[in-house]
Amino acid sequence: MLARYFTNLDRPVFALRNLPEVVKGALFSRYSRTEKSLRRVLLDEFINEPDSGFAQLAGTQAGADDMVAVRRAEEFYERVLVGYGDDSVAELAGAHVAVERVSTLAAKALEDSRIGISPLEKSTRYVRFDRPGPDGRYLYHRGPELAHPDYEVAADSLFKTYSELIEPLTLAIRERFPLVEGETDRAWKAATRAKALDMLRGLLPAGTLTNLGLFGNGRAFEYLITKMAGHELPECRGLAQDLHRELDLVIPSFVKRALDDRYGAPAAERISRIRAETARMAPRNHRSGAGPRVTLLEHDPDAERKVVAAALFPLSDAGWKELEGDPAALLEAMLGDRGNRRQRAPRALEHAQYAFEIVANFAAYRDLHRHRMLTQDRQLLGTALGYDLPIGLAEVGMDGRVRSAIEAAAEAHSRMERDAGPALAQYVVPLAFHVRWYFRVNLREIYHLCELRTTPQGHPDYRWVAQEMFRLVSEVHPRLARYARFVDMGPGDELERRRSERRMDEKLSALDRTQ
């Protein structure tokens, strides 16, 4: 009977299967209130307890009406979890949600959640964005709030330029990087196409439609919905309603408060009100020099001592202030034998803290925004900080067309900002334009971020940011930084994806040999 629901019946570690999310969450919640094993709880309190509702719920798993199943699950949850705190229990069950045809701006708002939600988004490196929609038009966000006469003209021009340059640029790249010995045609074509898309991604406006998948727990989704409901963009507020409607069909008990009159709606209104009140105090129209840059705003002069104390603390019986040691010897013991970047730096390094202000193009921001073990926020996307163009576009004579489309979009942005406000004007800004944001990050995450984002196959825009961050940390804390030995400060691969695609071929070949 129980074998259907667990991966084994006789070992202390096992996985759950063939159970609705709400039942899994309810089962795990019982760990805090019973001495029984989970398998015994399922048998005694769920399967053999007629009033639990489990029989009806389990019976809906195989083909019964989905709506009936969900409502039974909600009733089950309420019955079993009376007296439990909803918040912690809501972290014990989750859902997968697909969000399609949303703007890049809205995608960033969805992905801004740091804990409890894991996103994955359509890539500008591997996927063309010029395929028309069912109505034959380019895929960028349109809505009544974006009825400005310049918006669609500028966005269409950006997409048209992007679309018309993909094939000739790909051919030019293939002439510059011909097929080499030992490289398959598949790998070569994939690497050269990715290079072309990388070089042209700066043309895409922030209103470009993208797709993403979200996996998260109920508590995280509840807050995401509330936060989106208080967003300044109408598109994001609409997504709050869409997310709530769809999640109410699969995990209703976990998102029931997200927009309700008692909790969710007042919280969303408060988010909106605080933003408006704070905005009135924030200076605007400040002019600063254009161009990318990374600035170290803050660092802790006492970081070495704190790292030493944090490393010794769990192994000592002394108090924090009494813990002292030789930083060089301790760092060598903890990090001296690191063989690759996947051998993580220890938690003690989290006690060295840094704050950076970064100005880089919005495309690079999108890549670095994915990092979670830090605090970050950005300013509104605009055109005042200038934009980047890949050097390779000038080498093939395509920079003129790209500049023309980008600068026409900048003029449209100026008029939209005047007429519709800076938030809505973001939609027309190409990804090539710079945005300013901050990172507050610890040294452990510096190791992870900089070693990952400086690999030779990475995009040069975010490689440069990661290299600058690491250079600045190395200047103030050379001894703490020296063991991040897998940071690559070199120029990177000219054809960034060539090495990765060749490795993929090797993996595919090995897989074929085993089958």
Predicted regions and their residues:
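A conserved ligand/cofactor-binding region detector
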Residues: 1-515
